[in-house]
């Protein structure tokens, strides 16, 4: 089960940082050692400081600060607790934060390999360029 915790964390982090964003992630309560080991690995790697920030703690205590913090622009919730999902969505509505609920994922499946997961934290903007004939 340890590899699934690490695989799940990497599968959640990779689309966010691939899109050029920073990430604040909450480690799984059951297996926090995977996240702490990954944080130490990222610290010694060439990833700039502050790109990935891993926290340990209780999700019930940290969900509200995640959802209401004004510098957090998107929230991706991995889980199936309907009360926590409702709390995250209502708290995030204060600053029009994008909330994506992913549920429990099977990290070895084809759905976890979808490259469009990058779009969950991206803003698409259109720029018009004038053109003369």
Name each model-derived stretch.
Residues 14-17, 65, 91:
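Hydrophobic/aromatic ligand-binding patch that stacks against planar heteroaromatic rings
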Residues 1-48:
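Conserved small-residue-rich beta-alpha loop and adjacent elements
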């Amino acid at each position: 089960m340890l590899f699934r915790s690490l695989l799940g964390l990497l599968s959640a982090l990779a689309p966010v940082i691939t899109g050029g964003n920073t990430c604040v992630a909450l480690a799984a309560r059951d297996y926090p050692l995977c996240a702490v080991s990954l944080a130490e690995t990222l610290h010694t790697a060439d990833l700039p400081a502050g790109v990935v920030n891993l926290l340990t703690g209780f999700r019930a205590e940290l969900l509200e600060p995640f959802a209401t913090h004004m510098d957090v622009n998107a929230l991706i919730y991995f889980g199936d607790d309907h009360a926590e999902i409702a709390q995250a969505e209502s708290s995030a509505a204060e600053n029009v934060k994008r909330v994506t609920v992913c549920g429990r994922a099977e990290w070895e499946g084809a759905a976890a390999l979808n490259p469009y997961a990058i779009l969950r934290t991206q803003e698409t903007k259109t720029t018009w360029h004038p053109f003369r004939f």
